[in-house]
Amino acid sequence: MDFINIEKKWQEFWWKNKSFEPKDDFNLPKKYILSMLPYPSGEIHMGHVRNYTIGDALARYYRLHHYNVLHPMGFDSFGMPAENAAIKHGIHPKTWTYENIEAMQKEFEALGFSFSKNREFATSDPDYTKFEQQFFIDLWEKGLIYRKKAMLNWCPNDKTVLANEQVIDGRCWRCDTEVIQKELYQYYLKITNYAEELLKDLETLENHWPSQVLTMQKNWIGKSSGLQFGFKIADECLKACNNIQEIEVFTTRADTIYGVTYIAIAPEHPLVEHAIKRVSQEDSKMIKAILNTTQRERALEKKGAFLGIYAIHPLTKQKIPVWVANFALANYGSGALMGVPACDERDFEFANLYHIPIKVITQSPQNLPHTKEEILKNSGEWSDLSSSVAREKIIAYFEKENLGKRVINYRLQDWGVSRQRYWGAPIPMIHCKHCGIVPETQLPVTLPEDIVIDGEGNPLEKHASWKFAQCPKCHKDALRETDTMDTFIQSSWYFLRYTTPKNQRENQAFDQNYLKYFMPVDTYIGGIEHAILHLLYARFFTKALRDLGYLHLDEPFKQLITQGMVLKDGAKMSKSKGNVVSPKEILKKYGADAVRLFILFAAPPAKELEWNDNALEGAHRFIKRLYDKANAITPTTSKPEFKEVGLNEAQKLARKKVYEALKKSHEIFNKAESAYAFNTLIASCMEALNALNAQSDEQILCEGYFVLLQILEPMIPHTAWELSERLFKRENFKPIEVDESALIEDFMTLGLTINGKRRAELKVNINASKEEIIILAKKELEKYLENASVKKEIYVPNKLVNFVTA
């Protein structure tokens, strides 16, 4: 079997005939099948192969069944690795990127992926950047982008800012370097404006997205309802506080307000700047050090200092000490919180560490802290009430007395999108001394190519002829913005661009007719690691573009498949572990179809896949057996006709196995609850081939192969096209319906029991009468009934026969 040449033959045929381009007929039923676009690193890995094999199987199935399928591919081509390659190898990022794209395209073709070439692009293409920059300006003018100075997550290795979502366990999501804090100006997208909608619309994705992803997004958005109120600064402390009148706090546990024994404020809180003069030199040094630590570092060890000032409890009028605490976050609520050590684990630990008094306000006999809902005590007029009842009454009291109000808070923060690097989409803004920040009018703003990348700072800052520009408003000298956009902006709308053919998107980001027809994406495939990065950003960007009038949908992805990682020797494949399997080498040895079949058979998409050379050999042998048995079939040039006349049991079994597999294929591809368990479908195909291998009747073989090749085409397309052309001619190879009559059993299996104890099984004709079944059952149980007296015979149709003996 010369699988290499067979695969090349069909790959050339597909590209030459543009077999995978969707039709421009908006009346056809459509499917938009999309795998997350890759970064062009130069070589695809097994994670790519798995992702794109799953997507390709879906696309080919729907195409075979007369859907108008959009199955595109592109490249997420801006980013740090290109700059790192420039430093390491002395090659321009653009050259490195586009050479890698070309290499990866060849690998995709070698795997037989049915991508639409007429939709392909790279996100670093100038005509893509042009419309992205226009979106940026539109969002700026609508007030959905702003610029401010803030303490930001900084990756010392990549020398760039990271969004909160890009810091994982205190480390850079890309290079795993420990992140530090740095104060810089930054552009922000107001994703918080959409927090409630992003949260609420998760309900529309239930049963279509993995529950784990929905939970991760829900927790990241982090909605909480509570009481916002103030502790007034004690009169004698006002001067030290530069006349700041009160400390505003937010709490979800208003019922614990009588247990407050300290107030904790973030080191970034404006009060600290003035009151820090009252602390010791050692504490002052510690507070300043906290400012330069990440949230993860702050969580490792609780630290704080008493500021020497007090605030007044709004109900008891007692003086409450004010502390700086590293666990108080400036970007959540007001940056201040009430410390209730009797009812909160964190507050309790901090109080014990610094010997702060603890006031018990619940009637629980358990050890402190009492974190569960309890009956209150020492809580004024709300004593003896449950926590939940007291909470509502206290909030109502605060609102009635104008002491505070009920508010909603979100953990979600605005998305910082400025990056201090060269290889990214330039932010299209001009800084003018006279006009302020002015949007550029000549788009796209492209990157200068005559740059030096040495790893020291942002190359655009050093490029005078590019950096110095003219203000579009007053035409005086000005400075161009040298930060580039976070690459997650590019991946937040690429799926919209795919809808439109290349020749119709030169002057528009996407065509409205194509957009309305193909969107939303029907099935989106990618790793779960993107749950609160790309997937959340893409949902937000879709809603923001909707509000700008660019589109008319709320959610971009109807259904989501998160495929598991590919492991070898129990660990994720990586060069450092020395357990990488090269797709290129495997393709040379086994061919694309064997690799695809193994990928789909080894595990369901959502599960981790353990690489297994023996299983790959097994996939290869299955394909060889498929070719071998095909030699027993006489090719036909017309569509074969199938008749079920006078078949023996083995022939009926073969037909049954084939049509069972066909029925299963429709369930696997069309029912989300099947979890796309291709492994079970392939197992059914293997059973069907085993049954066909036992046959010599050419009619049975012909029908079996006609059906089996249709089932297998999405998974092993080269083999299916080769054999269907050879045996039936492709023009005759149309989808066939499940023959339900072939699935009907002629026999049924009954359990045989004596006094309820199972003794044997009986296979009988489904048309056998009760009397016939009883006679056959007694004969089968003869040795058990030999010396027994049967008092009662019980027949439960289609299930069992039970004999009650004396």
Swiss-Prot record:
The gene is leuS. It comes from the Bacteria. This is Leucine--tRNA ligase. PROSITE patterns: AA_TRNA_LIGASE_I. Keywords: Aminoacyl-tRNA synthetase, ATP-binding, Cytoplasm, Ligase, Nucleotide-binding, Protein biosynthesis. The keyword ATP-binding applies. ATP binds at residue 575. Its EC number is 6.1.1.4. It comes from Helicobacter pylori (strain J99 / ATCC 700824).
